[in-house]
Swiss-Prot record:
Protein modification: Phosphorylated during mitosis. Phosphorylation at Ser-144 and Ser-146 promotes its dissociation from microtubules during mitosis which is required for efficient chromosome congression.
Modified residues (Phosphotyrosine): Y226
Any one GO biological process: microtubule-based process
Biased composition (Polar residues): 881-893, 916-931
The protein, known as: Echinoderm microtubule-associated protein-like 4
Length: 981
């Protein structure tokens, strides 16, 4: 059994259908009651926390007034903001220093090990050590359980284990990125139920804690030697470099550089179906993450529709073959607010959004959809992913819902309008096929009766024959023809106008997974288990067949191509183009499991990725092609190229690491350090050392010789209290800076036996060769307010030291100015991923940025472009008419997009066209979605050269923001303005 069949569990047994329905109704009632009770409990808990905070505020003010009598006021050089009384339900006294914070685990295997919990020290001890280590000269600003006088009432809310009145709290484990990412990639009903509209109680407590903590400003000590930031109530000390005369004079602005999406590597075929089509323009349309890709395989160009806010799960083509409807799942933004599932109808030529349908209507996600054919695509039918799999019919141009009805509690795999009968809709799925009659605002159902034919476990797909009959393919490998009766079979004993089985055809070994009706009336079928594509004539006799090679996986989608070609989407995320005579050619491919490892070549346009699927892939970033791939013995997690570019080191989950030849992909060397996940591999600038950061809290050092082909153990850095997350080398190979899952910033003296440098201020002026550590004076401004320390997965500084790219847990890629040494720094923010962004890396010449998605398995290539300073509404068109590499000084158009009112549930952002005509007037469509202050960023058609002849390109710069607006990082929604007519 393939696909959905493998992930569904039919465990309900009952004497009759009515009995089953009664039991389900009772269970649903109980679940609803429990949800109501939980909601009440959450509200009560929030009220208790609010009252407790108010009480402590009162006690603090009393103590402050008593302690201030007869005492001089403290020095005012230590700024500290107070917690306001606004939004009291979200306030909570910060007890985080009494909470044991488990290490952030980046992968599910690490989450199961429990190693971080075993090796952690109690947080109170860690704080005590941190304070004694860095605050000897300024004890007055040390975090203390006692109230602080004057302008520092916030300190009252912080309690440490030393406090006599402190009450120990339960250990709260910090969530891993995998836990915080959207669970949209799991197929079971249980996993879908994880997406709740109301945050669970365990999530409520840290969220309220974060609300209190985020008001803590960065503290600078009296002498101006170091500053402190707070993470979950814990102080993190960073020493100020000597070349900073006055910290207050530092200004952090938006970088002039911006990103535009150039290429999306990968395809989502693993858990989707019928999602590959060829448009009349010659482009293949498919999706990966939240991006819908229009790929011209002959010219090797891509265009991208970027309107979606989360995973795209299905698509349908309008009868005019120009307009497209795509449906997405529900998501959650960084503040825990739900992002509603919806359908977007858009123009594949202009990339402009025509309509947004179903906000607030669909639950969990959109499972399948289809345009009507008999009335030229006026209507759209949609099945959502709720328990009831609601069927809705829409006049999509008017955004009007015509009818709505529950279909079944079983999974629904397909929905289609009848091509000639505008009032007939067919749905199929697990153990059923339903024929719906749509009349005005009502839908009536007639169930397909299998009668003497064996009832399949799944009706997988359906199509229509030229005479109006319905053709279905099922999990038994059988095709059934359903014909509509015009007269009663037996007068008075049977209904007329119903569909009955008229013929059965054995088509495949295993399931019939997809059906494709061709323009000439012939039929293509795709098998699951046998991986065969069969061509059937007009009488449904098999004519030709071809088998998809096993390495590509099973068939998920089949579509007609040009001439005698056809397109195939597979379960291993390949899109193949083939013919029965010549076989298959790979057009699109990607990883098939969670992706973390990324490295860019030191002087070539190459990038390497490794993932849990055990694939190591080398990609050409200029030609957008795969150079080679190799299957290694274990899942890969991190990688780094030797400075010579001849070899690359791959770290795995088990502590083993491999060295591969970058040209031949041959195995050069293999080593093992510990038995836990390796999180970072980093060569020194001259390639003579390799540092290996592990989840066993150690950094292993190797001497490297023979251009990266020989390794000998040099030493081990011991001192971190949690697993290693990031590390960087100094230019002279003498020092290493490292971060851990416990928010530590440690420095190591390599020549003197890899010793920990106790006086960290000695390292404040080191000019690090690379900057990938997420904690440090030069980069701490990238952290959002109220962060729990797990929100940023990766950071990288450009080689020219102008910008920092950041990968976060909320599907966003950020671009900051470097250095970024002020809290709440503004950034450009970009959306394309639909899972936590796991890694970022600049190419060798800083022309591009590469980002990787975790569970969405995508690789996104962004082009860095300079923003031109233009007066508002003034446009400059690129007059380049020949195909040439896109310059970083491409013409841009500047426009300010008003921030939508926060009361709107979903910000309907206009999808901006990648190209404009000679009269570039922007069309702004509002999205109904709550977002942060947004910057519009137009996506040009991504290709190896510039646009088609005569089509000027443009870029829309972001809005400049004030210091007040910079409190929340700017949201840079990729949007495509439609061209003016």
């Amino acid at each position: 059994m393939d696909g959905f069949a493998g992930s569904l569990d039919d465990s309900i047994s009952a004497a009759s259908t009515s009995d089953v329905q009664d039991r389900l109704s009772a269970l649903e009632s109980r679940v609803q009651q429990q949800e109501d009770e939980i909601t009440v409990l959450k509200a009560a808990l929030a009220d208790v926390l609010r009252r407790l905070a108010i009480s402590e505020d009162h006690v603090a003010s009393v103590k402050k007034s008593v302690s201030s009598k007869g005492q001089p006021s403290p020095r005012a050089v230590i700024p500290m903001s107070c917690i306001t009384n606004g939004s009291g339900a979200n306030r909570k006294p910060s007890h985080t220093s009494a909470v044991s914070i488990a290490g952030k685990e980046t992968l599910s295997s690490a989450a199961k090990s429990g190693t971080e919990k075993k090796k952690e020290k109690p947080q109170g001890q860690r704080e005590k050590k941190e304070e004694s280590h860095s605050n000897d000269q300024s004890p007055q600003i040390r975090a203390s359980p006692s109230p602080q006088p004057s302008s520092q009432p916030l300190q009252i809310h912080r309690q440490t284990p030393e406090s006599k009145n402190a009450t120990p709290t339960k250990s709260i484990k910090r969530p891993s990125p995998a836990e915080k990412s959207h669970n949209s990639w799991e197929n079971s009903d249980d996993s879908r139920n994880k997406l709740s509209k109301i945050p669970s109680t365990p999530k409520l407590i840290p969220k309220v804690t974060k609300t209190a903590d985020k008001h803590k400003d960065v503290i600078i000590n009296q002498e101006g030697e170091y500053i402190k930031m707070f993470m979950r109530g814990r102080p993190i000390t960073m020493f100020i470099p000597s070349d900073v005369d006055n910290y207050d004079d530092i200004r952090t602005e938006l970088p002039p550089e911006k990103l535009k999406l150039e290429w999306a590597y990968g395809y989502r075929g693993k858990d989707c179906r019928a999602n590959v089509y060829l448009l009349p323009t010659g482009k293949i349309v498919y999706f990966i993450a939240s991006v819908v890709v229009l790929f011209n395989y002959e010219e090797r160009t891509q265009r991208h529709y970027l309107g979606h806010t989360d995973c795209v799960k299905c698509l349908a083509i309008h009868p005019d073959k120009i307009r497209i409807a795509t449906g997405q799942i529900a998501g959650v933004d960084k503040d825990g607010r739900p992002l509603q599932p919806h359908v977007r109808v858009w123009d594949s030529v202009t990339l402009s959004t025509l309509q947004i349908i179903g906000l607030g209507t669909f639950e969990r996600g959109v499972g399948c959809l289809d345009f009507s054919k008999a009335d030229s695509g006026v209507h759209l039918c949609i099945i959502d992913d709720s328990n009831e799999h609601m069927l809705t019919v829409w006049d999509w141009q008017k955004k009007a819902k015509g009818a709505e009805i529950k279909t079944t509690n079983e999974v629904v795999l397909a929905v289609e309008f009848h091509p000639t009968d505008a009032n007939t809709i067919i749905t199929c799925g697990k153990s059923h096929i339903f024929f719906w009659t749509w009349s005005g605002n009502s839908l009536t159902r007639k169930q397909g009766i299998f009668g003497k034919y064996e009832k399949p476990k799944f009706v997988q797909c359906l199509a229509f024959l030229g005479n109006g009959d319905v053709l279905t393919g099922d999990s038994g490998g059988v095709m059934l023809i359903w014909s509509k009766t015009t007269v009663e079979p037996t007068p008075g004993k049977g209904p007329k106008g119903v569909y009955q089985i008229s013929k059965q055809i054995k088509a495949h070994d295993g399931s019939v997974f997809t059906l494709c009706q061709m323009r000439n009336g012939m039929l293509l079928t795709g098998g699951g288990k046998d991986r065969k594509i069969i061509l059937w004539d007009h009488d449904l006799n098999p004519e030709r067949e071809i088998e998809v090679p096993d390495q590509y996986g099973t068939i998920r989608a089949v579509a007609e191509g040009k001439a005698d070609q056809f397109l195939v989407g597979t379960s291993r995320n390949f899109i193949l183009r083939g013919t029965f005579n010549d076989g298959f050619q790979i057009e699109v491919q990607g990883h098939t499991d969670e992706l973390w490892g990324l490295a860019t070549h030191p002087f070539k346009d190459l990038l390497l990725t490794c993932a849990q699927d055990r694939q190591v892939c080398l990609w050409n970033s200029m030609e957008h092609r795969l150079e080679w791939t190799r299957l290694v013995d274990e899942p890969g997690h991190c990688a780094d190229f030797h400075p010579s570019g001849t070899v690359v080191a791959i770290g795995t989950h088990s502590g083993r690491w491999f060295v591969l030849d970058a040209e031949t992909r041959d195995l050069v060397s293999i080593h093992t350090d510990g038995n836990e996940q390796l999180s970072v591999m980093r060569y020194s600038i001259d390639g003579t050392f390799l540092a290996v950061g592990s989840h066993d809290n150690f950094i292993y050092l190797y001497v490297v010789s023979e251009n990266g082909r020989k390794y000998s153990r040099y030493g081990r850095c011991t001192g971190h209290s949690s697993y290693i997350t990031h590390l960087d080398w100094s230019p002279d190979n003498k020092y290493i800076m490292s971060n851990s899952g416990d928010y530590e910033i440690l420095y190591w003296d390599i020549p003197n036996g890899c010793k920990l440098i106790r006086n960290r201020s000695d390292c404040k002026d080191i000019d690090w060769t690379t900057y990938t550590c997420v904690l440090g004076f030069q980069v701490f401004g990238v952290w959002p307010e109220g962060s729990d320390g797990t929100d940023i997965n990766a950071l990288v500084r450009s080689h020219n030291r102008k910008v920092i790219a950041v990968a976060d847990d909320f599907c966003k890629v950020h671009l900051f100015q470097y250095p970024c040494s002020k809290a709440k720094a503004p950034s450009h923010k970009y959306s394309a991923h639909s899972s936590h962004v796991t890694n970022v890396s600049f190419t060798h010449n800083d022309s591009h940025l590469i980002s990787t998605g975790g569970k969405d398995m995508s690789i996104i290539q962004w082009k860095l472009v300079e923003k031109l300073s233009l007066p508002q509404n003034e446009t400059v068109a690129d007059t380049t008419l020949t195909k040439a590499p896109v310059s970083s000084t491409e013409s841009v158009i500047q426009s300010n997009t008003p921030t939508p009112p926060p009361s709107q549930p979903l910000n309907e952002t206009a999808e901006e066209e990648s190209r404009i005509s000679s009269s570039p007037t922007l069309l702004e469509n509002s999205l109904e979605q709550t977002v942060e202050p947004s910057e519009d960023h137009s996506e040009e058609e991504s290709e190896e050269g510039s646009g088609d002849l005569g089509e000027p390109l443009y870029e829309e710069p972001c809005n400049e923001i004030s210091k007040e607006q910079a409190k929340a990082t700017l949201l840079e929604d990729q949007q495509d303005p439609s061209p003016s007519s």
